[in-house]
Amino acid sequence: LQTRIEVACSGLGADVKADPIVAETMRNLYDGVPMDEVYKASILAARTLIEKDPDYTYATARLLFHTISREVLGRDVAQADMGQAYCDYFPGFIKKGVDAELLDEKLLQFDLKRLGAALKADRDLNFDYLGLQTLYDRYFLHVGKTRIELPQAFFMRVAMGLSLNEIDREARAIEFYEVLS
């Protein structure tokens, strides 16, 4: 937990520290608490510090992104490994969305591996808390109550929809994605 929170705070300036988040998180835990609740507690602890220093919004968003990626991918993935995780996940995500009748079958005609390779995982670090929470609550696709979409996949999905009728669909989708994300 300490390491996860330290990573979320890294690069955000000297005033954004992991220790207050860890301390508040630990205060709200009890014996036998499930890991999902531990992660939620860390998000809530970080969120309370946004008023003190607005840069905590980025640390909070990074903690939220971790819980979203765990929900979508079904496992912990370090941010450094998210580029490959996106490549591996993206074709299956489109297929799952089509199978659930949430996405148009025409999206399966794209070169999904090429589009997955174009996703920029480091852009997930640019979200503030409110922006990422809004995407999660309102826009990310879900099957039942489980989200199946990650932020960069969301932007690429929108880009694919915009480029359905283009001659070089993949190139145009990547161009649109670059603008959107």
PLM ranges: what are they?
Residues 1-181:
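Extended catalytic cores of very large enzyme megasubunits
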